[in-house]
From Swiss-Prot:
PANTHER family xrefs: SERINE PROTEASE INHIBITOR, SERPIN (PTHR11461), UTEROFERRIN-ASSOCIATED PROTEIN (PTHR11461:SF164)
GO molecular function: peptidase inhibitor activity; serine-type endopeptidase inhibitor activity
Sugar-modified residues: N222, N268
GO biological process terms on file: female pregnancy
SMART domains cross-referenced by the UniProt entry: SERPIN (SM00093)
A single cellular component GO annotation: extracellular space
Signal peptide: 1-25
Protein name, per record: Uterine milk protein
Tissues where the protein occurs: Secreted by ovine endometrium under the influence of progesterone.
Pfam families per record: Serpin
Protein family (similarity comment): Belongs to the serpin family. UTMP subfamily.
Residues of the site described as Reactive bond: A390, N391
Amino acid sequence: MSHRRMQLALSLVFILCGLFNSIFCEKQQHSQQHANLVLLKKISAFSQKMEAHPKAFAQELFKALIAENPKKNIIFSPAAMTITLATLSLGIKSTMSTNHPEDLELELKLLDAHKCLHHLVHLGRELVKQKQLRHQDILFLNSKMMANQMLLHQIRKLQKMDIQMIDFSDTEKAKKAISHHVAEKTHTKIRDLITDLNPETILCLVNHIFFKGILKRAFQPNLTQKEDFFLNDKTKVQVDMMRKTEQMLYSRSEELFATMVKMPFKGNVSLILMLPDAGHFDNALKKLTAKRAKLQKISNFRLVHLTLPKFKITFDINFKHLLPKINLKHLLPKIDPKHTLTTTASSQHVTLKAPLPNLEALHQVEIELSEHALTTDTAIHTDNLLKVPANTKEVPVVVKFNRPFLLFVEDEITQTDLFVGQVLNPQVE
């Protein structure tokens, strides 16, 4: 099952290439269907070569982002990226003919694979209901193109996607319109969402997600105070440090030079925080993929006195710029930029003959953690849980996040990473 989720995660590289042919009506419908069939076969064939767990793919993305942004706070959602693009892949599938056995077989495989994402989709909706998450997908289509309305209806139905028609020929006006609409829909002040836009752009996909987890056991607001956070050996900043003492999952790895704690959010979601030792942040990152699972396995419940900074992080990802940098470029079919997909009725053979369209895809994530995560009623209900029993003889382990650290928000049922990030400076959003 995890293998199928990995297939969908990897397929996002190819989905953007195939989306144009599936959304816009062309004169040669026969050609369109066969082109889509070939693209989907390549998605399946190339994805099957990768047998790693979805976490491995998330870590590859993480490494690429860190290489590009070594001194920035980072946060992204592998799950949100996968769900959004997988929904669009259904649009490609829906335009294909199922008259041939091989077409039907591929379609069934894709449907079966999408079932693996149903849990994540359901989880996302539950988090929205619990007011822990806001999620918005917006698809901007070139207003000068004739769109397949049946397909657009399917995308709206499956993903509740906001679809807007826009004229990309006036790039400055289009950039402002996109930023304004996204800000209005996501209730955020977004500046320079798109810095570079081609007037021949066919579509622009914006995926925005905001997460503010509700901890089952809140931090105590009266204990929050200003303290030093060490950005490096020479630089420190004053930040609001939260505190609490409670039983939580704790583990320590001398091999990884890191300490880990895990706290539950409301629902089947948990926050995993990893604190590399001073001077060992880069070393922990290198070993993270192989050692994180081991670190979680050796964890046990301990009484922990936790000190953690309040933070709010916003981070943007441009798919087009990122994907070629995550060691997946060699999996892409080699397409001459001067060619496009066509077919002949006699041979049913797909050849390549004109340029592929310009596409844009952006992923924006915001995450916030504070001591005010719980509602008043829940905070009162759990007040007793925050207190350490007076007769306890256990000495609490002190874990102080006063230097750069890593975070993971994980789905407890599938162990899927909902969010992955690094906090280098809690003062900077």
